[in-house]
Amino acid sequence: MNMPLHQISAIPSQDATSARVYRSKTKEKEREEQNEKTLGHSMSHSSNISKAGGSSVASAPVSSFPRTSVTPSNQDICRICHCEGDDESPLITPCRCTGSLHFVHQTCLQQWIKSSDTRCCELCKYEFIMETKLKPLRKWEKLQMTSSERRKIMCSVTFHVIAITCVVWSLYVLIDRTAEEIRQGQATGILEWPFWTKLVVVAIGFTGGLLFMYVQCKVYVQLWRRLKAYNRVIYVQNCPETSKRNIFEKPALPEPNFESKDGRGVCHSDTNSSCCTEPEDTGAEIIHV
């Protein structure tokens, strides 16, 4: 029985390794080509987008873009109105806040204190050091009140004047009649019952009048305090800690260096010209003229 014959080819080891290297190189080349193709597609897509965007930007007018200041400002500004300080309204440091919240105008802070009715910073909770002063009398302003409040005050004042006049006149009449009865009683040695009745009525009327005047005077005192508070100016002092810190944090002025590093001479700078003076030769002879 004849068996089929298979041809077996023996390849040396060196040829096998070279074939493997060749295959790996071809695979790497194929991968690189694929990567280049994908990169080419993405670059072409991005270039198309950039061209479209560039054409739209070029077609847009220049005036359509808002003009904003990009340059940073190194000057201090008020944290309420965001304005700089000047000679008329300087900036103060009333609390321990730092950074952009460090400075504030005196007038802005006064208005904020009046509107919020607080005496401390809302951020660092530092109590302001305040000094109050009253305006001169000729500069006092009228208290802001409604017409109904003014009408009530005028009626109250008129009623009180009339009531005080009546009470004083009644007391004068009662005291005069009582004194006359006392003189008559001293003559007879007996005081009649109407005398004690009049005395009790006078005492009750006097006590009631005093209580009524006390209650009404409290209302007038409150109005007076409101008027004083309205014509009072509040000055907020600088925080002592921040003022000391600002003094210590001021940069020292650089001392002028009159000696050059190479020791050749002294350079003097001027706005119009600059010159360098050479050192004098110590060995030069002095010529007498």
UniProtKB/Swiss-Prot annotation:
Pathway note = Protein modification; protein ubiquitination
Question: Basic and acidic residues: which segments have biased composition?
Answer: 25-39
Residue ranges spanning the membrane: these are 155-175, 195-215
Q: Which InterPro entries match?
A: Znf_RING, Znf_RING-CH, Znf_RING/FYVE/PHD
**Matching Gene3D superfamilies, A to Z?**
Zinc/RING finger domain, C3HC4 (zinc finger)
> Keyword annotations for this protein?
Adaptive immunity, Cytoplasmic vesicle, Endoplasmic reticulum, Endosome, Golgi apparatus, Immunity, Lysosome, Membrane, Metal-binding, Transferase, Transmembrane, Transmembrane helix, Ubl conjugation pathway, Zinc, Zinc-finger
**Could you say which enzyme class this protein belongs to?**
transferase
Claim: Transmembrane is one of the keywords in the record:
yes
Q: What is its EC number?
A: 2.3.2.27
Subunit structure, briefly?
Interacts with CD86.
Write down what this protein is called: E3 ubiquitin-protein ligase MARCHF8
Low complexity: compositionally biased ranges? 50-64
One molecular function GO term is:
ubiquitin-protein transferase activity
Q: Which reaction does it catalyse?
A: S-ubiquitinyl-[E2 ubiquitin-conjugating enzyme]-L-cysteine + [acceptor protein]-L-lysine = [E2 ubiquitin-conjugating enzyme]-L-cysteine + N(6)-ubiquitinyl-[acceptor protein]-L-lysine
User: What Gene Ontology terms describe where this protein resides (cellular component)?
Assistant: cytoplasm; early endosome membrane; endoplasmic reticulum membrane; endosome; Golgi membrane; late endosome membrane; lysosomal membrane; lysosome
> Which residues of the sequence carry a binding annotation for Zn(2+) 1?
C78, C81, H105, C108
Q: What does this protein do?
A: E3 ubiquitin-protein ligase that plays several important roles in innate immunity and adaptive immunity. Mediates ubiquitination of CD86 and MHC class II proteins, such as HLA-DR alpha and beta, and promotes their subsequent endocytosis and sorting to lysosomes via multivesicular bodies. Possesses a very broad antiviral activity by specifically inactivating different viral fusion proteins. Targets and ubiquitinates cytoplasmic lysine residues of viral envelope glycoproteins with single transmembrane domains leading to their lysosomal degradation.
Which BP terms in the Gene Ontology apply to this protein? adaptive immune response; antigen processing and presentation of peptide antigen via MHC class II; immune response; protein polyubiquitination
Gene that this sequence comes from: MARCHF8
